Amino acid sequence: MSNKKIIKIIKLQIPGGKANPAPPIGPALGAAGVNIMGFCKEFNAATQDRPGDLLPVVITVYSDKTFSFVMKQPPVSSLIKKALGLESGSKIPNRNKVGKLARAQITAIAEQKMKDMDVVLLESAERMVEGTARSMGVDVE
């Protein structure tokens, strides 16, 4: 693949196993000339074990209209909502608290997300998770 020229990089967040040609996937890939159904089938096959998880994906489109994609870990906010069983964070995070995140949960989320974060220490990743939790109206132990 080193001889192929990259013409476009597309970043999307798609629920695992639920890629389809409807917006926003179809228009983004169609504008780049990518086979939309080919991408949807490959993505759904790769994410069939993670249904419903919101997965960031980086799609690289090459000059011959082929593509490759890299999946990342779900966003921290999504992991926090899943850990606490929430639909959404607080509308007023300073006043209305929607849950409490234990230290063990923070560490587990930080360990899972650490490969996508630009940090070396687990403690730094934990602080980033804590900050996201606070901005969502979740108390941190």
From Swiss-Prot:
Give the UniProt record's GO annotations in the biological process aspect.
translation
Q: Which SMART domains match?
A: RL11
- The answer to keyword Lipoprotein applying to this record is no
| Alphabetized Gene3D superfamilies for the sequence | Ribosomal protein L11, C-terminal domain (1.10.10.250), Ribosomal protein L11/L12, N-terminal domain (3.30.1550.10)
Protein modification: One or more lysine residues are methylated.
Task: Give the GO molecular function terms.
Answer: large ribosomal subunit rRNA binding; structural constituent of ribosome
User: What keywords sit in the KW lines?
Assistant: Methylation, Ribonucleoprotein, Ribosomal protein, RNA-binding, rRNA-binding
InterPro entries found in the cross-reference section: Ribosomal_uL11, Ribosomal_uL11_bac-typ, Ribosomal_uL11_C, Ribosomal_uL11_C_sf, Ribosomal_uL11_CS, Ribosomal_uL11_N, Ribosomal_uL11_N_sf
One short Pfam name that applies is Ribosomal_L11_N
Q: Which family does it belong to?
A: Belongs to the universal ribosomal protein uL11 family.
Whom does it interact with, and what assembly results? Part of the ribosomal stalk of the 50S ribosomal subunit. Interacts with L10 and the large rRNA to form the base of the stalk. L10 forms an elongated spine to which L12 dimers bind in a sequential fashion forming a multimeric L10(L12)X complex.
Q: What is the protein name given in its UniProt record?
A: Large ribosomal subunit protein uL11
What is the protein's species of origin?
Chlamydia muridarum (strain MoPn / Nigg)
Supply the gene name. rplK
